[in-house]
Design a protein with these regions (language model features):
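Amphipathic alpha-helical segments used for helix-helix packing
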Residues: 106-131
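Solvent-exposed, amphipathic alpha-helical segments
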Residues: 26, 30-37, 84, 112, ...
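Hydrophobic alpha-helical connector segments
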Residues: 72, 82-111, 162-166
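Hydrophobic/aromatic residues within well-ordered alpha-helical segments
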Residues: 23, 66, 73, 77, ...
């Protein structure tokens, strides 16, 4: 056939020309976009196939189940986010880094975490990814607390224990702020900052005075979740 008589390529044939890594990346990013609008529980393999523009069987070639796929999507987003977070924190002084990490994150970012917590009880692969990245977050905060104490700005007999405590406080406040809307942004930050200052022996008001921008909430490029109602 010459060029004029050759049929145009289909979406599936274009997908077939992509590398394995490119196909997998497309599928994961499409899943994240769907999670942003439908939640983890609302995503099906057929939805993802339609979003990517491929046949259903191609999705199953890379992910044996819906549970495996949504876990991979969450894992990809958080791994990308935390890598960016670490780079940002490393460029800040210790006190500003602490304030940046503890600052309330954008609503669209935390709603995905809250939705993941809700779905994890029914999706073991997602629960495993959630647990792994929760520990990653605790380790990042532990490192920041260690930097604060090493600079002589605060005290901590056990940075890891203080990290677990402050992570629990920040998560609880985030639920009340983002999911329940019973406290506003200023109050949410004030609660977490005040408890952190007391726990670490910091000068009262020092975290707010650091005037930080949130260090978290930068999802993977082209897959940033949009706000949705829970």
């Amino acid at each position: 056939l010459d060029n004029e008589s050759r049929p145009p390529p289909t979406l599936d044939s274009v997908a077939e020309r992509k590398t394995s890594d490119e196909r997998r990346d497309d599928i994961v990013r499409a899943t994240l976009r769907l999670v942003a609008t439908k939640g983890f529980a609302g995503v099906t393999l057929r939805d993802v196939a339609t979003e990517v523009g491929v046949v259903h069987g191609l999705i199953r070639h890379y992910f044996a189940s819906r549970d495996e796929l949504v876990a991979a999507a969450f894992d990809f987003a958080v791994t990308t986010e935390l890598s960016s977070d670490r780079a940002q924190l490393d460029g800040l002084d210790p006190l500003t880094a602490l304030a940046a990490w503890l600052s309330s994150t954008p609503e669209d970012h935390y709603r995905v975490w809250i939705d993941a917590w809700s779905e994890a009880a029914r999706t073991p692969p997602l629960a495993a990814a959630l647990d792994r990245h929760h520990r990653d977050c605790e380790r990042i905060l532990t490192d920041v607390i260690t930097r604060v104490t090493a600079a002589g700005l605060g005290i901590s007999a056990d940075p890891a224990a203080d990290s677990r405590l402050l992570t629990a406080v920040a998560d609880g406040v985030a639920v009340q702020h983002h999911a329940m809307a019973v406290i506003g942004l200023a109050e949410a930050n004030a609660i977490v900052f005040t408890i952190a200052e007391r726990q670490l022996g910091l000068t009262p008001g020092s975290l707010a005075q650091a005037n930080p921008a949130p260090a978290r909430g930068l999802w993977a490029e082209d897959a940033a979740p949009a706000p949705r109602a829970l």
